[in-house]
Amino acid sequence: MAPRRLLLVGEGNFSFAAALSETLDQSTQLTATCLQRPAELARDPLAWENLQCLRERGIDVRFGVDCTQLADVFELHEREFDQIYFIFPHCGRKAGVAKNRELLAKFFQSCADVLAEEGEVHVALCRGQGGTPADKPQREWHNSWQVVAMAALGGLILSDVYPFSCKAVAGYKCTGYRSQDKSFHVEGALNHIFTRSLPFEGSQPRIFRIKLGNQWFSFPEPEALVGKLNRGFLEAPSCHPIKTINEKLIAELGKVFPLKRLKCSYPLLPQEGTSVLPFWNCDFLSAAFWISLHEDNSNSESLTGGTSQDVEDFLVSFSELSLLKNPGRDGKEEACEGTCGQAKICLRPSLLVHVQDVIEVPDFLSGSLHILSGPVFQKCHILPFTMPAFHETLFILGVNQNLKDGCLQSLLDHLKGILDSLLTQTLPESSKLSSLVKFVLQSNGKDYMIRVKTHNFSPDCTEDLIIGSVITSATSVIHKDQCFVFVSMNLDLLAMLVWCISDWRMLWTFDNRFLKNFVPGKIEPFKSHSLYPPCYVHDVSFWIDQKKGFDELEFHTVARAVSQDTIISIQFLSRFQHPKTQQVSLCYRLTYQTCDKALTQQQVASMQSQFRKEIQQHLYVIPR
């Protein structure tokens, strides 16, 4: 293993460097720096004593180092520091919060040039300066140093924070109060640890290629679903918590019911296939993502304008997919040739669309749980527990009419017990007194919604989450003596509840640190690698075209696409009607916040500007 490389910046009397050097093993390389020149430290006996100790230990000491220009100090071969420390940074004298924010911003940007890929930046701040909820008490945002927002300018996120203890660094003496040889209060001080964030990728969607017979077709990834297609969370090699919770659920039900797992690898549906689905909620269709397949005669290497992915097994059972036809010369339809061949399809909004295919096969096994699992996609409003893409498991049970009530009750009882067991594993014993799961009978008197209390997120959270549904059906055309029960489960919400993951977007992160939280065979509360990300708020108001109307669902979908899923809230503020023209204006408030990446105020301003352009173009509104 390569030796660790540590960098200390902004040292005053070098007492922190001297104390830290005593705790390090011989393989660790320490570089201690300060802004002052040696002559400026000549009047400080403690500084000279510490410098002498450092030199005796072979520590690299450098003077006149500006922590905001680290790339100018270290050659390329000297960089790649594993840890960079800045202990109680300040601009000196009576500098206000604005000056100290500027210092932090430039420091973090400078760190990005010399920090190792998996390195850490440690910044100790006095009580309240950081402006995060970890500070007790927490200062108002405008009166703090806004350390997390400043770190974002350097592409860094806050990954840990804990109390700074002088006792843990024996011999350290803080100094520099108002640029004097005076100490300052460090009670309640915090050490903030920052790590590199994944960068925001360009908004160019990936291009997917699929094969129909001998012909390749392509389509761009919907912008509102960037990073959501073809992730393979449920596939064999995956150790994703969504797969873990699905396997646990299936295994427990398998102790009571015989199981038959069905292959479900295609989330695309042909347009004509959506009209023959008796179990389809009409709301699904209005919220579906519709896309067009286009003939693609290029090879995958020659595609431009996006990342190409060949997904032969991923998308669709293409024997059911029909191309759009052109009228032939004899009045019959014939398929378009060349690049005019295309098909209108939608991304599957629910696994219920496959029910008909499953229950109508002649060899359907009565009394067995038939299981489908896969991703589904729906346009939706931007809300904390509503997601445009999630993984669903569908249990299909066919039973004799005479046994319906008993089998249904048995299934619900066992499912309730399994869910209660899973959902209470991360709760303290005092919270396990009552069931978290309720089956709420619907107005039709036969179907149920599966509701769960959300104590896992916060004791103050009183809203129940709907994590699934139970649908009972009449007999099928082929199996007239049977009735059917369909249990649909939102695996993403279930995983969030089990592991206390408060933000659904974290399940889709590309950051490898996410999966390191999950140990096989154990369920422990999730710890995010990005703490206290800052929020940025922007308002937008616009005149609507009253003839064309205003589609609020599409408004949310455009916001999701433009912001790359960084908008966490859209709040309707007001409606205004001009007294003379009768023209109507709407005003909304958008809140931006990421869960896993560094997001700057400048990036948000750019997104907001682009959002105004997009809604004008696609929703026929006139921004004010």
UniProtKB/Swiss-Prot annotation:
GO terms for biological process: rRNA base methylation. It comes from Homo sapiens (Human). The lineage of its organism: Eukaryota, Metazoa, Chordata, Craniata, Vertebrata. Residues 531-624 form the FDX-ACB domain. One of its GO terms (cellular component) is cytoplasm. One of its GO terms (molecular function) is rRNA (uridine-N3-)-methyltransferase activity. This is Ferredoxin-fold anticodon-binding domain-containing protein 1. Pfam families: BMT5-like (PF10354), FDX-ACB (PF03147). It comes from the Eukaryota.
